[in-house]
């Protein structure tokens, strides 16, 4: 079984609390054999994303992922904002939908594959993305990372 994940890089996110929680667990996930790809701050699909959401654009867009998309065995898909964490599970502030349809699952899988294309992501195991991040952002992630946030992340 292969599990591939595409998520936000530190460069592509403004949610430093969530990133710090993920960052604390990243090595464990890699050690388990997961393939982790992190979204670039300037993906090749940037113009497509801008055009798609132009009406929502109020300032310089941050190219981050928020929706969670999952395809299992090519025929079952999940799309939602649910974070697969205790906070989302217990406070019920997120939503998601499970779809059992091959054609829809295939379309979602193609969108995920596009996000994972090399021009849109970094390989979390191979790249040194921190060179693209300012000192203050690194410091904030480090500080968030030492707080006991595990129960809610």
Region annotations inferred by a language model:
Residues 1-153:
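PLD/PLD-like phosphodiesterase catalytic module centered on the HKD motif
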């Amino acid at each position: 079984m292969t599990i591939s994940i595409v998520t936000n890089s530190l460069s592509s996110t403004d949610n430093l609390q969530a990133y710090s929680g993920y960052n604390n667990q990243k090595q464990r996930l890699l050690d388990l054999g997961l393939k982790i790809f992190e979204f670039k701050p300037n993906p090749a699909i940037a113009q497509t994303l801008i055009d798609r959401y132009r009406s929502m654009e109020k300032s310089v867009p941050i190219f981050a992922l928020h929706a969670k998309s999952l395809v299992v065995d090519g025929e079952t898909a999940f799309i939602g904002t649910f974070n697969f964490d205790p906070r989302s599970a217990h406070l019920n502030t997120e939503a998601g939908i499970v779809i059992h349809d091959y054609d829809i699952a295939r379309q979602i899988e193609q969108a995920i594959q596009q996000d994972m294309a090399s021009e849109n992501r970094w390989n979390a195991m191979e790249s040194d993305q921190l060179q693209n991040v300012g000192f203050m952002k690194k410091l904030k992630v480090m500080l968030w990372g030492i707080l006991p946030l595990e129960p809610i992340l």
